[in-house]
């Protein structure tokens, strides 16, 4: 059985309709929907996510309060859960199209100005450059993150993008050469991510369990992960001008702050 959790700050009818419409494309699958409405504060969110922890599944949520929506994003990242925000991207796009501020976003204080459009442009760029896509655009990135699978490249990229940085991320895979364009990027813009072996094994194992796959394969095997990280470190040592940070047990916010601090503000946007 697959669990789908529906979080809403109202009755939850809207998020359920969207979820059911999407699920019609997946027949003959045993799916349990769990609707959690009236999510009004952080305590409500924590109670809901504790339930998800006990029976992992995917979360769909519609929270018009942007502070609560951000709190959900932070928590699901920390807990290694899968979640989809169904309303915030839509509201941003409508606000951009209509040149109006949404009426029911009490936490949203942005103005429709060049700063807002620049940040949205950064997000669009970052999405298109995720996981090594379109390497020809690496030279356009403010920051290029590199690292092995599940080392926080994507969540870090998106967090930085929402701060206005154009970010690309490139996977480091043992036995496969990274794109040649990476060597052409100014070294002060490249950040290598490293992580503790056991921590990465735990993250990958949790990922496999969420996908209903066995964690016993090579992807989460301690020795294999150790070899991947050793290969990654050797690759970083061959590029001493690159910044390398350890993301072990750090939140996305902490890792992002370290990256921006250690880059000495050369590409500061805030």
From Swiss-Prot:
Reactions it catalyzes: N(tele)-phospho-L-histidyl/L-threonyl-[pyruvate, phosphate dikinase] + ADP = N(tele)-phospho-L-histidyl/O-phospho-L-threonyl-[pyruvate, phosphate dikinase] + AMP + H(+); N(tele)-phospho-L-histidyl/O-phospho-L-threonyl-[pyruvate, phosphate dikinase] + phosphate + H(+) = N(tele)-phospho-L-histidyl/L-threonyl-[pyruvate, phosphate dikinase] + diphosphate
Record keyword Nucleotide-binding present: yes
Positions of disulphide bridges: none
Organism domain of life: Bacteria
GO molecular function terms listed in the Swiss-Prot or TrEMBL record: ADP binding; ATP binding; phosphotransferase activity, phosphate group as acceptor; protein serine/threonine kinase activity
Keyword Transferase: yes
EC number: 2.7.11.32, 2.7.4.27
Alphabetic keyword roster: Kinase, Nucleotide-binding, Serine/threonine-protein kinase, Transferase
Binding-site list for ADP: 147-154
Span of the signal peptide: none
Cited function: Bifunctional serine/threonine kinase and phosphorylase involved in the regulation of the pyruvate, phosphate dikinase (PPDK) by catalyzing its phosphorylation/dephosphorylation.
NCBIfam families xrefs: PRK05339.1
Family assignment from sequence similarity: Belongs to the pyruvate, phosphate/water dikinase regulatory protein family. PDRP subfamily.
Protein name: Putative pyruvate, phosphate dikinase regulatory protein
């Amino acid at each position: 059985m697959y669990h789908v959790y529906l979080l809403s700050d109202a009755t939850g009818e809207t998020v359920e309709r969207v979820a059911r419409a999407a699920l019609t494309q997946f027949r003959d699958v045993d799916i349990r929907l769990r609707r959690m409405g009236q999510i009004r504060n952080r305590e409500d969110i924590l109670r809901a996510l504790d339930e998800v922890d006990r029976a992992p599944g995917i979360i769909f949520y519609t929270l018009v309060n942007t502070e609560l929506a951000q709190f959900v994003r932070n928590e699901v990242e920390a807990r290694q859960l899968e979640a989809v925000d169904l309303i915030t991207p839509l509201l941003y796009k409508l606000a951009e199209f209509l040149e109006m501020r949404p009426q029911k976003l009490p936490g949203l204080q942005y103005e429709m100005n060049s700063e807002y459009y620049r940040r949205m442009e950064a997000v669009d760029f970052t999405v298109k450059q995720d996981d090594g896509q379109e390497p020809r655009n690496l030279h356009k990135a403010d920051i290029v993150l590199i690292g092995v699978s599940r080392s926080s490249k994507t969540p870090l990229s998106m967090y930085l993008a929402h701060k206005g940085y154009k970010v690309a991320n490139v996977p480091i895979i043992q036995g496969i050469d990274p794109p040649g364009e990476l060597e052409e990027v100014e070294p002060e813009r490249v950040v290598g991510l490293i992580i503790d072996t056991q921590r990465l094994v735990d993250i990958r194992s949790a990922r496999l369990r969420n996908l209903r796959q066995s964690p016993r394969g090579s992807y989460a095997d301690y020795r294999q992960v150790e070899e991947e990280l050793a290969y990654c470190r050797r690759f970083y040592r061959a590029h001493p001008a690159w910044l390398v940070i350890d993301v072990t047990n750090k939140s996305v916010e902490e890792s992002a702050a370290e990256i921006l601090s250690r880059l000495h503000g050369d590409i500061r946007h805030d």
